[in-house]
């Protein structure tokens, strides 16, 4: 394994419980981090220890610089994650997946094996095996492309509607 400078392995996870007095108390993080063979961890990457059990980085995982891995997360084998990505607590990332730069994943999700997450995807739902998602909120690639094409046409559609409204108004005035 290779761990580059300024990385933190085993920091406390972000665990706090609200109290009746509107303050928060720290939930003890007493778990650990397991890093398997042939893992590369880039500079300034943080991997939080689990609350009770283990945060697991499986064999062959490659983590770029500036990544946050939350408590209880498991990264599947041979998965690669680009810089400035964050994976919130208790998420399971499938094997042989690719996360582009600045991907954000909310907690407690299950991400499919052999899946791809485009740069800046905001993943808020479970994903299937072999799925490619894009956007924020993240959606399947084909759905995103259709939505994007329509989005680009919106100014023209609005102009057409305004012209039709004028014509209708003129007809009603007669």
List the predicted regions and their residue ranges:
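Structural signal for interior beta-strand "rungs" in well-ordered beta-sheet cores
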Residues: 1-140
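Long, leucine- and charge-enriched amphipathic alpha-helices
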Residues: 139-174
């Amino acid at each position: 394994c290779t761990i580059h400078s300024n990385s933190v392995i085993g920091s406390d996870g972000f665990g706090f419980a609200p109290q009746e007095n509107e303050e928060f108390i720290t939930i003890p993080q007493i778990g650990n981090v397991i890093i398997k063979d042939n893992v590369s961890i880039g500079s300034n990457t943080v991997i939080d220890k689990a609350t009770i059990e283990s945060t697991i980085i499986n064999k062959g995982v490659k983590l770029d610089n500036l990544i946050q891995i939350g408590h209880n997360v498991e990264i599947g084998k041979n998965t690669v994650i680009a810089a400035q990505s964050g994976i919130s607590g208790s998420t399971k990332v499938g094997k042989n997946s690719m996360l582009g730069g600045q991907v954000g994943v909310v907690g407690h999700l299950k991400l499919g094996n052999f899946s791809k997450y485009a740069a800046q995807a905001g993943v808020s739902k479970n994903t299937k095996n072999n799925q490619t998602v894009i956007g924020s909120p993240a959606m399947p690639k084909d759905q995103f492309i259709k939505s994007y094409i329509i989005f680009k046409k919106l100014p023209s559609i609005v102009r057409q509607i305004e012209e039709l409204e004028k014509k209708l108004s003129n007809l009603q005035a007669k």
